[in-house]
């Protein structure tokens, strides 16, 4: 499959998804940053204003493995929330395979990780730790590992 076909699949899901909201007010806590990042990514998709290339081949096995990893995460952490799971799945596929951005927004900080960007490269202080987790999405995230 190529990125055009993958984008079309993502777009078809997103165009019918109408439950996206931006948190009111401005907050720098990790959840608010992630929610806004996902919202603006969603808007980018439905407005078809993405900076990624749409003529690159993508390995179907990698995309399917990625989808399975998202499903696994949600079954472990939020079973039954299929609509939100699929929303996050398609946002994450878009970020990873089409626009090649970090799965977490630049500036997010938690006790477990911080994501930064330098010279158009993303860095994550948690990748080295979390990539060892079963079905970790870190395997596919473009962020590079960085020490604290």
Where are these regions (language model features)?
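Cysteine-centered metal-binding/redox modules
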Residues: 5-148
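C-terminal, active-site-flanking charged/polar segments
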Residues: 1
């Amino acid at each position: 499959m190529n990125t055009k076909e993958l984008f079309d699949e993502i777009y078809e899901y997103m165009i019918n998804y109408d439950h996206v909201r931006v948190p009111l007010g401005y907050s720098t806590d990790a959840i608010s940053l992630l929610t806004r990042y996902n919202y603006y990514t969603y808007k980018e998709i439905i407005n078809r204003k993405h900076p990624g290339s749409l003529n690159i081949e993508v390995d179907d096995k990698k995309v399917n493995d990625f989808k399975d990893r998202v499903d696994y995460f949600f079954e472990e952490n939020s079973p039954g929330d299929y609509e939100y799971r699929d929303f996050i799945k398609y946002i994450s596929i878009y970020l990873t395979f089409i626009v090649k951005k970090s799965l977490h927004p630049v500036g997010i900080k938690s006790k477990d990780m911080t994501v930064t960007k330098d010279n158009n490269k993303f860095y994550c202080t948690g990748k080295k730790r979390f990539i060892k987790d079963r079905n970790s999405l870190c395997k596919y995230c473009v962020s590079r590992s960085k020490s604290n």
